[in-house]
Regions:
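N-terminal mature-domain "stem" immediately C-terminal to a signal peptide or N-terminal signal-anchor/transmembrane
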Residues: 22-107, 305-328
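Active-site recognition of the HExxH zinc-binding catalytic motif
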Residues: 225-246
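Active-site scaffold of zinc-dependent metalloenzymes
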Residues: 112-117, 172, 190-225
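Bacterial N-terminal signal peptides
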Residues: 8-16
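Long, mid-chain structured domain cores
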Residues: 76-174
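Pan-zinc metallopeptidase signature
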Residues: 282, 290-361
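Auxiliary, metal-adjacent structural segments of Zn-dependent hydrolase domains
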Residues: 150-205
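Post-HEXXH active-site segment of zinc metalloproteases
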Residues: 242-270
């Protein structure tokens, strides 16, 4: 693709689009859950703060080796990677001891080939540090600490949050529509509210982890983000994307300077690759459900990761063309074939349309 083609296509895609949807219904009991197992894996970015807690005086607070190794872990892997790996084990989400046992005996060769990759190699590079720190946390009474000090705060945040079942039903109706023929769990993604994270991330077993900060209306208003936005976003990660589509994305990266420059910046945030597709789909679903207006759609594209997801507004612009029964993956492959593939002239037409709108305005 000629480098100049993607930019005008992006500019044209930023024009407002309205959408609507019918609300659905559904029952989603036990939407929120807690997990001592995931929380113990998420402590490393906050190791210094944890060691200073009076509960750990004389144990972690006096163990400089623990802190040194925790810092090493934090510099190499993210909590989302550790939680994702443990999610594949089938172990208890409530028992930190099972986490200790899993990482002490973990064999990367036992993993399915499809989940292996650089992230597993990164975890393996700090296996000794992980084993030591997890054992020290267990010995210092982390399970008791979590029950007494972490869990009550999480339960309070959960109890204060209110959501209507019909809202969840409408969301999952939209996600099922985007899935095409792909089967999805009818009750949606299980949500773990963790005390040791300040973000949200999806897990490979179609569940996801979320900070309790997103359940607080005041925090949501302050940072212009709310739990339902994150819930939609993370559930959209359940949609399958084919190797063929990812190859198309790589071809674009290899052949388009404009896209490559922005994609490199997105990757620096840890949000590259197919993340632009999910961002576009979240805005599309939220707009169809009437949760946001056109200005909020545009604002998200401009500010999310500093506007680096240049494909997101293009995908959003054409999502209304999703065919009946077509999967999100099928739609994206068709979009690449007809609109973003190398050599097409759509970008030039979009540039002419954009200039016409500017002159008319």
């Amino acid at each position: 693709m000629k480098p100049q083609l993607l930019l005008p296509l992006l500019l044209a895609a930023l024009l407002p689009m309205t959408a609507s949807a019918q609300s659905g219904e559904g029952e989603f009991p036990d939407l929120f859950n807690t997990s001592a197992a995931y929380d113990i894996l998420a402590v490393f970015p906050q190791a210094d703060k944890l060691a200073e807690d009076p509960f750990f005086t004389g144990t972690l607070g006096a163990d400089t080796l623990f802190l040194d190794r925790a810092h090493r872990i934090d510099s190499v892997v993210r909590p989302s990677q550790l939680c994702n790996l443990y999610s594949l084990s089938g172990g208890s989400k409530d028992d930190p001891e099972q986490v200790v046992e899993f990482f002490a005996s973990f064999d990367p060769e036992s993993l399915p080939q499809k989940v292996r990759g650089a992230w597993i190699d990164e975890i393996c590079s700090v296996r000794d540090e992980l084993s030591y720190c997890l054992q020290r946390l267990a010995q210092a009474g982390y399970a008791q600490y979590w029950q007494e000090q972490v869990r009550p705060c999480l339960n309070n945040a959960i109890e204060q949050y209110r959501i209507a079942p019909e809202q969840l039903g409408a969301i999952h109706q939209e996600i099922t529509r985007l899935a095409g023929g792909q089967p999805l769990d009818a009750t949606g993604s299980r949500i773990y509210i963790l005390g040791n994270i300040d973000n949200a991330f999806a897990l490979l077993d179609e569940t996801f982890c979320c900070t309790p900060l997103l359940l607080d209306p005041e925090t949501a208003r302050q940072y212009r983000i709310d739990f339902m936005q994150v819930y939609i976003h993370e559930n959209l990660h359940r949609l399958s994307l084919s190797g063929e589509l990812l190859d198309m994305l790589q071809t674009l990266y290899d052949n388009d300077d404009f896209y490559r420059t922005h994609e490199d910046r997105a990757r620096a945030y840890g949000e590259g690759g197919n993340e632009a597709f999910v961002v576009a789909a979240e805005r599309y679903v939220s707009r169809r459900l009437g949760r946001i207006d056109d200005k909020q759609v545009l604002d998200e594209f401009l500010v999310y990761c500093d506007g680096t997801h240049v494909l997101a507004p293009i995908v959003y612009r054409y999502l209304p063309d999703l065919r009946n029964g077509e999967s999100f993956d099928g739609f994206l492959r068709r979009l690449f074939d007809r609109r973003i593939r190398p050599g097409n002239r759509f970008g030039k037409r979009c540039e002419r349309n954009r200039r016409h709108r500017i002159n008319a305005g």
